[in-house]
């Protein structure tokens, strides 16, 4: 039953479906380094626990151009695994290219997408499967994401919880202790390291938009943001499953102000792209989006005020982050204006 196949694919090249899996766990990896082994090992444990609920489970690891030779680590961790598994090599850089390759190469009607730097609670997959069986009408799923291992103590300017936490970077997802359905909207939804779908969602609404998401040389995020915006506009909701827990680390290289500013600048760019994907058009003067200027002015005034009123380092840096977001929005809109059309539309099919 165990498989160690290694397949190559571009993001839009369909792979033959292998076996008759009912559930597909798809892990996206690019240079996972020391995090990959624990991610695969703890995911294996979670899958093995779930086999008593559903024995037809497959595990795909989609490698998106790693240079750290992950195959040896994967083979070591999955040797003798009592379920189908394989590695898919997605050749086109970008997390959404990798996700789409995983969708095309998997067979399950129930799909869970995860990252290769998280660690899994042993009951992670069991919680999802039980919730899915008890809520057959649910089509989108979110698990709980907690802050995992810190490679260094968090600096004073970095809030890990509360209203100042940047949960798109210090990744977290928590909507309480009850399994419940929640509307998809701008402030509520699953997060990329721990989310699930019934396959018919992609059949009906299309795959992930490859104009969005982190890729080599780009810190513009929002890989799943466009998908959830698309689904929200069609009235879909998501089922939050609190027992489906993963732990997301915070790496030393990420705990710098420069990294956060770049990521938040990317958040602003992603917001601009999302609004364009909706067909929204901005009023500009010399490339400057007029509707954004009040938000940028307010954010800048708040940043200055946070210094003048001797607010905490975390409060001051949160205000700095808001400025970075709106500057990113203006940057993306200016690029679009200068090009005369979205520079990203050349790389992707139209959004459904």
Protein language model features and the residues they cover:
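A conserved acidic beta->alpha catalytic loop
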Residues: 42, 63-72, 118
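Short aromatic/hydrophobic "clamp" motif used to bind/position activated sugar donors
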Residues: 111
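Glycine-rich, basic loop-to-helix element that forms the pyrophosphate-binding segment
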Residues: 90-106
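Short, flexible, basic/aromatic active-site loop/helix in glycosyltransferases
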Residues: 161-187
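Conserved donor NDP-sugar-binding/catalytic core segment of glycosyltransferases
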Residues: 123-160
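Short, well-formed alpha-helical segments that are part of the catalytic scaffolds
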Residues: 32-48
